[in-house]
Amino acid sequence: MLLGLAAMELKVWVDGIQRVVCGVSEQTTCQEVVIALAQAIGQTGRFVLVQRLREKERQLLPQECPVGAQATCGQFASDVQFVLRRTGPSLAGRPSSDSCPPPERCLIRASLPVKPRAALGCEPRKTLTPEPAPSLSRPGPAAPVTPTPGCCTDLRGLELRVQRNAEELGHEAFWEQELRREQAREREGQARLQALSAATAEHAARLQALDAQARALEAELQLAAEAPGPPSPMASATERLHQDLAVQERQSAEVQGSLALVSRALEAAERALQAQAQELEELNRELRQCNLQQFIQQTGAALPPPPRPDRGPPGTQGPLPPAREESLLGAPSESHAGAQPRPRGGPHDAELLEVAAAPAPEWCPLAAQPQAL
């Protein structure tokens, strides 16, 4: 069943035949559509309009609008089909349900409008004209039908009876639908409760197993701490490496300390050698001066002084001034030239000249005798 909104016509499947109900608007209810179709097929009884979308079916209430119900499907509105089903014979023997109050509406359907019942003395409503239309083209305007005077009363009674039947059927379907919904919710709740109970039991069992495992691990750790076993090869190797590193560090520290001591001792030895060299040099210088003085004294004692008429008394002769080591080791002429000048004709001029003219072989053995002294 497809709905053409532009043509304002509703397609309903009745006993496997597609029929088109013209003049349908957004305010047209399911009750009006059912009455029109029942009059068109000429059958009496209880009917219900079913909305089918793919594999799902839903019974429409008498006051629902098929156009609005189809519009709520959105993009699947073109897949919606309406089917008219006959649920049973008409309730001719039952008392009129005009005096019976309508059933209470639950909160889910409380917003649906309730249409007032038509009075018996009111004018007959405008009937809808269902016509079978296998094609999608809109039919042309139908010719007006003139009802006969004798059939008006019968038609009016039939309409009222069909209306009551549709209302009762709509209420029954509504309560059946609500019952099915509540039963489905109850089944869902029970299934969820069972699933939660099973999950709770499973988690409790897992918690107990984990608790037992944790206690076992704690006991093992306590036993391992109280009675340590043989160390693992990795731990022993690591410990040996740490010990070797500590020994090497101590050895390096000792070597560095010994190197520092050796360097300080070497510096002290160098200073001592320098001091000894200086002392030896001073001793050599003093020894040479002593040798020079001894040589001068020996040479002066061996050579008699020449007789001079102007020489003073022997007791007035002063000591011989020592000559410098460097000038004596060098040329005798330089030593004589570097000596302090004395006045010519002094008492020691002849002796100084004789010492300066002495041969060199006699000086060398004396200068080379520091150990004999």
Swiss-Prot record:
> What biological-process terms (Gene Ontology) are attached?
apoptotic process; signal transduction
Where does this chain mainly localize?
Answer: cytoplasm
Judging by the UniProt lineage, the source's domain of life is Eukaryota
PTM text:
Polyubiquitinated and degraded by the proteasome upon prolonged stress stimuli.
Question: Membrane-spanning regions, if any?
Answer: none
Region Disordered, residue ranges: 122-150, 300-356
A cellular component term, taken from the record's GO annotations: cytoplasm
Coiled-coil ranges (or none): 175-227, 248-297
Q: Does the keyword Lipid biosynthesis apply?
A: no
A Pfam family annotated for this UniProt entry:
RA
Record's subcellular location: Cytoplasm, Cytoskeleton, Microtubule organizing center, Centrosome
Location of the Ras-associating domain: 6-89
Print the keywords alphabetically: Apoptosis, Coiled coil, Cytoplasm, Cytoskeleton, Ubl conjugation
Q: Could you give the subunit structure recorded for this chain?
A: Interacts with MAP2K7 and GTP-bound NRAS.
Give the protein's biological function.
Answer: Negatively regulates stress-induced JNK activation and apoptosis by promoting MAP2K7 phosphorylation and inhibiting its ability to activate JNK. Following prolonged stress, anti-apoptotic effect stops because of degradation of RASSF7 protein via the ubiquitin-proteasome pathway. Required for the activation of AURKB and chromosomal congression during mitosis where it stimulates microtubule polymerization.
Which protein are we looking at?
Ras association domain-containing protein 7
